[in-house]
Amino acid sequence: MLPEIGAAELLIIAAVALIVVGPKDLPLLMRRIGQFMAKVRSMASEFRASFDDMARQSELDDLRKEVEAMRRGQFADMSIADGAMTEAAGDIEKSLAGVGVQLHSPTGYENTVEPPPPEPEPQPAAEPAPKPARKPRAAKPKAAAAPKAAAKPKAAAKPKPKPKTPGLKARKTAGSAE
């Protein structure tokens, strides 16, 4: 609200309004004051928005002028630089023409010199032969597996267990009871 009006001042204003207007018309008066304040605030915000738009527009105009000035300055600098480049190229050509050297443009350059033949690479004196790659175990033939088995003799052959039969167990238990 207003920074100059405190709580005490608001109470005094409310008491005077109650006495002057009366309790019957006070709610209607408060509603009209609220509507008036809303209109004032909306008008102030519209004014502020239009003022901000004008400020932005003037800033944009200034920026546009600066950009145009920079563009003109750059193109002017480019034409000056282009003139200086052509002048320098002309000076170089004149000085080389006095010596008897001809300049060729890079696009018209042809290589007339043949490159020297490549020198043969020296071979190393002794290079170990590379080991052959191992084959996977699944890919080995079965014939190769037999000599390995013969090369490694088994220490002792275990006897095969006898097959168990149900009748045999019953006989042993019956025989031990006798």
UniProtKB/Swiss-Prot annotation:
Disulfide bonds, paired cysteine numbers: none
Chain positions covered by the region annotation Disordered: 104-178
One cellular-component annotation, GO: TAT protein transport complex
A biological process term (GO) from this entry: protein transport by the Tat complex
Superkingdom assignment: Bacteria
Biased composition (Low complexity): 141-154
A GO MF term: protein transmembrane transporter activity
Record keywords: Cell inner membrane, Cell membrane, Membrane, Protein transport, Translocation, Transmembrane, Transmembrane helix, Transport
Pfam families in UniProt: TatA_B_E
Membrane topology, as annotated: Single-pass membrane protein
Chief location: membrane
Membrane-spanning residues: 2-22
Localization per Swiss-Prot or TrEMBL: Cell inner membrane
InterPro entries: TatA/B/E, TatB
Compositionally biased spans, kind Pro residues: 114-131
Family under the similarity heading: Belongs to the TatB family.
Subunit note: The Tat system comprises two distinct complexes: a TatABC complex, containing multiple copies of TatA, TatB and TatC subunits, and a separate TatA complex, containing only TatA subunits. Substrates initially bind to the TatABC complex, which probably triggers association of the separate TatA complex to form the active translocon.
Summary of the function given for this chain in its UniProt record: Part of the twin-arginine translocation (Tat) system that transports large folded proteins containing a characteristic twin-arginine motif in their signal peptide across membranes. Together with TatC, TatB is part of a receptor directly interacting with Tat signal peptides. TatB may form an oligomeric binding site that transiently accommodates folded Tat precursor proteins before their translocation.
Stated name of the protein: Sec-independent protein translocase protein TatB
Species annotation: Phenylobacterium zucineum (strain HLK1)
Name of the gene this protein is made from: tatB
